[in-house]
């Protein structure tokens, strides 16, 4: 797990940074090239040795997610089709690899209740910061509080014990990019520097299939092999990804 510096910008609440570190079990490492930076507006992740990559933060209120919510494909989005949204059916979903919460937010904006699991404390802190700002927003706060929640836990452990059982478990494990690093999106380069590869991702499929009551959906790059080497004939395809769909295990 990558080390981080914990920094507060001028005008930010230094006491809030200390409370955040205590809550998420984060320790300041002065030699780390990654930093969690509390600004007066939000919590950000920065790669100090590559400042041109910019800052990573979770924003459910504005930016690309707001645009996607207002003008995106809605129920026609591939992730919506993959989890089975249809008519009045809005499945209860566990996103076991929440990351920056983008797909989870899309599903919540369409009406699903989504529980996000995130094991990395720095990522969980970023997600929670974004959630709290989203909960406080007059437009999306009322439904966001009802539909999108965060659990800081190891997915492998949580999938064995989580109650109530969800209808759908969604998995989007980190997979090495095929492109040269310069072509990988800047935000993903910063994010990957923090979390590394999901080396234990294959171990998620079986417990996910035991927990879900309807289906497990695994998002993969189009060139990636199936998770855990388990092929399935059922998939929703996009130009660059596929959503492999698995039946539950009895």
UniProtKB/Swiss-Prot annotation:
Any one GO MF annotation of this record: rRNA (guanine-N2-)-methyltransferase activity
SUPFAM superfamilies, alphabetized: S-adenosyl-L-methionine-dependent methyltransferases
Cell compartment(s), UniProt: Cytoplasm
Keywords: Cytoplasm, Methyltransferase, rRNA processing, S-adenosyl-L-methionine, Transferase
Residues annotated for S-adenosyl-L-methionine binding in this entry: 102-103, 118-119, 154-155, 172
Catalytic activity from the UniProt record: guanosine(1516) in 16S rRNA + S-adenosyl-L-methionine = N(2)-methylguanosine(1516) in 16S rRNA + S-adenosyl-L-homocysteine + H(+)
GO cellular component, one term: cytoplasm
Enzyme category, top tier: transferase
EC number, as in UniProt: 2.1.1.242
Pfam family, one: SAM_MT
HAMAP family in UniProt: 16SrRNA_methyltr_J
Annotated family: Belongs to the methyltransferase superfamily. RsmJ family.
Protein name: Ribosomal RNA small subunit methyltransferase J
Organism the protein comes from: Edwardsiella ictaluri (strain 93-146)
Gene it is expressed from: rsmJ
């Amino acid at each position: 797990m990558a080390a981080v510096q914990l920094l507060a910008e001028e005008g930010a609440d230094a006491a809030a940074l200390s409370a955040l570190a205590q809550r998420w079990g984060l320790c300041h490492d002065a030699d780390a090239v990654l930093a969690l930076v509390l600004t007066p507006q939000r919590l950000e992740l920065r790669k100090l040795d590559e400042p041109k990559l910019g800052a990573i933060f979770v924003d459910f209120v504005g930016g690309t997610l707001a645009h996607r919510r207002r003008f995106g494909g809605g129920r026609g989005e591939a992730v919506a089709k993959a989890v089975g949204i249809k008519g009045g059916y809005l499945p209860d979903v566990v996103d076991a690899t929440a990351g920056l919460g983008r797909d989870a937010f899309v599903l919540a904006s369409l009406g699903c209740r989504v529980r996000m699991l995130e094991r990395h404390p720095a990522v969980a802190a970023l997600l929670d910061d974004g959630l709290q700002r989203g909960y406080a927003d007059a437009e999306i706060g009322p439904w966001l509080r009802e539909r999108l929640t965060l659990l800081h836990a190891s997915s492998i452990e949580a999938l064995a014990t989580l109650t109530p059982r969800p209808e759908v478990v969604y998995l989007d494990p980190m997979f090495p990019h095929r492109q040269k690093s310069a072509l990988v999106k800047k935000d993903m380069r910063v994010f990957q520097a923090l979390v590394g590869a999901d080396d234990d991702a294959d171990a998620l499929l079986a417990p996910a299939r035991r927990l879900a009551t309807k289906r497990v959906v695994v998002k993969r790059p189009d060139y990636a092999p199936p998770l855990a080497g388990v092929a399935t004939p059922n998939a929703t395809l996009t130009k660059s990804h596929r959503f492999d769909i698995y039946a539950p295990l009895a």
